[in-house]
Amino acid sequence: MSLDLDQVVADAQAAFAAANDNATLENEKARFLGKTGALTELLKGLGKLDPDARKTEGARINQVKQQVEAALQARRQALADALMNARLAAEAIDVTLPGRSVARGSVHPVMRTWERVEQIFGSIGFDVADGPEIETDWMNFTALNNPDNHPARSMQDTFYVDGRDSDDKLLLLRTHTSPMQVRYARMHVEKYAGRAMPPIKVICPGRTYRVDSDATHSPMFNQVEGLWIGDNVSFADLKGVYTDFLRKFFERDDIQVRFRPSYFPFTEPSAEIDMAFGNGKWLEISGSGQVHPNVLRNMGLDPERYIGFAFGSGLERLTMLRYGINDLRLFFEGDVRFLRQFA
């Protein structure tokens, strides 16, 4: 029995030490400590001994069992430590390696213009309004005094959307941000119903859509429109506000601006706003005018009491002039080489 016990301990220690993974180790455990293991068989043999020998050998077998279990636990810990060390080695960071630069994004040049326009007009008391890009035919055209036979209503100029709204009105992708002015004015009038109404001063930047595409036009473009309505707002106010805006936007005090008579259905009188460039050249930069009485009525205002002006400019046009870009399509191609210049 003594020889058997010593051999069991030696065999168990050798078997556990040879196990290179947990599955093998568990198999070896079963060989020595399982229901049919070597120690279990020795315990079964105690019944053949006399009481005194059974007591002595039982104590020795339990001592051997503890030695085997200790060897098993030590090997388990060794395997766990080896696995952890391997993981740490695989995930180790070499602090002597040079650092990796983090890719840095930047604001798109058109969005730079958008934010700059909001900041400039915000500094003189204009709110910023937002509205849906899918508009009703009424909001986009009728409310703005566009007649039913106006060319802008044709499918050659406007993207119409299948279906109608809850009032059975035609739906389309807005061709300008003027509908936002109408929506804002109507909410303003409703808000101050029955009490003194402060002037309406708002700009409406946003995406707009028209069936057009070339070096200076895109089927989707960004526009900002402004509206100022009050008891005594004149064309002189329009000239002062927009001229001041251009000088702040381009950071030049010597900018020359002219207002050239034009026609828009939603303003009367109307004017194109041109900005002077070198060699006596002028470039159209905005459309503007005094808000038409019919538009004021559609806003819920009395044209006999209220008067105001509106203007609209393309954000891409302003961006092209500010940065000297000659092709509108560059803004939409996602060319990192181009965009990186504005980072």
Swiss-Prot record:
| Classification via CDD domains | PheRS_alpha_core
Which residues are listed as membrane-spanning? none
Protein's cellular compartments: Cytoplasm
- Identify one Gene Ontology CC term for this UniProt entry: cytoplasm
Single GO term (MF): phenylalanine-tRNA ligase activity
Q: Which Gene3D superfamilies match?
A: Bira Bifunctional Protein, Domain 2
PANTHER family according to UniProt = PHENYLALANINE--TRNA LIGASE, MITOCHONDRIAL, PHENYLALANYL-TRNA SYNTHETASE
- The name of this protein is Phenylalanine--tRNA ligase alpha subunit
